[in-house]
């Protein structure tokens, strides 16, 4: 065993001990030598705000063209602030919802004021990734100058061709949507995917006291994994057994429908409509690429997120077999059995063009068992490099030592882990 392979083994062992479903494969020792063992795998969660494309409509809803003054609900008659699209210091374009704020300076997108009341002040914000994603934590929308009194969060799973409501928000759910108000904590394992209306994020408490509107993901996970999410195996088991649960957290696009702005805890005051508008400083979407449990990495390729597929799969979401592998054998990976899951790997020797080489034999129509002097998926590579001694016993000694060290590391990390 070369030092490079030894280090690879050690690193993969350490990574496997640290996290679930972050490895697609690792080298294991068998009677036939070291072979790849495949696992269900998924990319790490990250903030998707840097990758989202923002579209705001209707046209002209963003303030500043023409320039206009506005007030705040706390100081409704001090209308000294101005929005001017032609002045970078006074402009509030949509991209300020996803920029990195520096030196404590808050930047935000802002709409025109409600000067056309009683015509509704409506705005749609569509977030697109051109990629299937899965929510992994709470979605946060940060509003400046007050949260909307009525709003809807929609999602699409087909790149915006069709939409479905994700959650309703209102200061009075019964009046706005004819729905009884609920919180996520009111839900049970049997109705955790229910679309609810919540009043939790729409009541007036002052624009500076509470700015965030959330779509709660952690609380939904906690129904299965416990309040501290320490029983993730239970969640992953439910993801497999409960119809619609995985799809509930899956999306390609999100849309905010802003239906009525903050009113300051009272009715619309028609003598001063310059204090009514929407302003958003940040949208944070913690998620991971959906790769059907066939990839541990997701990279930006030509401007689009792309799963780096394993298990003989391909496609943006690893949604089909590689060329030369039977399409009918494709399946999404499974979280079960925990902790490594089932990769549902497409067979490596199910086509004539993929017959094992150099005297290798096909084992259970899944992998090639190679003669001692050859290696590789199809036994296509010689184990002995030119000019090197292939009969040294040091390889066996190093392999044994690594396996012992790997076992010790796994037990040590399991002892230290809160899970």
Task: Please give the residue ranges for each predicted region.
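Cleavable C-terminal sorting propeptides in eukaryotic secreted/cell-surface proteins
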Residues: 394-419
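Aromatic, loop-rich ligand-recognition surfaces of beta-strand-rich domains
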Residues: 2-51, 60-65, 77, 101-172, ...
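C-terminal GPI-anchoring signal of eukaryotic secretory precursors
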Residues: 358, 383-403
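Non-cytosolic beta-sandwich-type ligand-binding/adhesion modules
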Residues: 39, 47-51, 55-57, 66-104, ...
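Flexible, disordered linker segments and immediate boundary regions flanking tandem C2H2 zinc-finger modules
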Residues: 177-180, 328-337, 387-392
């Amino acid at each position: 065993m070369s030092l490079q392979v030894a280090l690879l083994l050690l690193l993969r062992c350490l990574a496997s001990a640290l996290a679930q479903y972050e490895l697609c494969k690792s080298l294991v020792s068998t009677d036939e030598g070291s072979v790849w063992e495949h696992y269900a795998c998924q990319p790490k969660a990250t903030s998707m705000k840097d990758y989202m494309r923002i579209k705001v409509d209707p046209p002209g809803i963003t303030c500043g063209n023409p320039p206009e003054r506005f007030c705040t609900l706390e100081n409704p008659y001090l209308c000294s602030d101005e929005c001017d699209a032609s002045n970078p210091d006074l402009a509030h374009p949509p991209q300020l919802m996803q920029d990195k704020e520096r030196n404590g300076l808050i930047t935000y997108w802002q709409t025109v004021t409600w000067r056309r009341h009683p015509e509704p002040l409506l705005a749609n914000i569509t977030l697109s990734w051109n990629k299937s994603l899965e929510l992994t934590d709470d979605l946060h929308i940060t509003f400046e100058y007050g949260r909307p009194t009525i709003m809807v969060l929609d999602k699409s799973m087909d790149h915006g061709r069709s939409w479905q409501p994700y959650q309703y928000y209102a200061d009075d759910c019964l009046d706005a949507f004819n729905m009884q108000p609920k919180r996520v904590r009111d839900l049970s394992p049997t109705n955790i995917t229910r679309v609810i209306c919540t009043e939790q994020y729409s009541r007036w408490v002052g624009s500076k006291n509470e700015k965030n509107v959330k779509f709660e993901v952690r609380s939904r996970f906690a129904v299965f994994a416990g309040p501290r999410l320490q029983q993730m195996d239970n969640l992953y088991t439910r993801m497999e057994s409960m119809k619609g649960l995985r799809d509930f957290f899956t999306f390609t696009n999100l849309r905010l429908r802003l239906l009525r702005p903050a009113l300051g805890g009272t009715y619309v005051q028609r003598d001063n409509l310059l204090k009514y508008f929407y302003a958003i400083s940040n949208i944070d979407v913690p998620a991971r690429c959906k790769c059907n449990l066939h990839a541990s990495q997701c990279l930006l390729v030509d401007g689009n997120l792309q799963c780096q597929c394993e298990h003989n799969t391909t496609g943006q979401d690893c949604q089909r077999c590689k060329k030369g592998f039977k399409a009918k054998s494709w399946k999404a990976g499974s979280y079960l059995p925990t902790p490594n899951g089932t990769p549902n790997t497409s067979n490596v020797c199910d086509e004539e063009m993929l017959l094992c080489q150099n005297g290798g034999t096909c084992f259970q129509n899944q992998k090639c068992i190679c003669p001692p002097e050859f290696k590789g998926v199809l036994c296509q590579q010689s184990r002995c490099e030119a000019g090197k001694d292939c009969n040294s016993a040091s390889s066996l000694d190093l392999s044994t030592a690594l396996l012992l060290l790997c076992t010790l590391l796994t037990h040590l990390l399991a002892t230290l882990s809160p899970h």
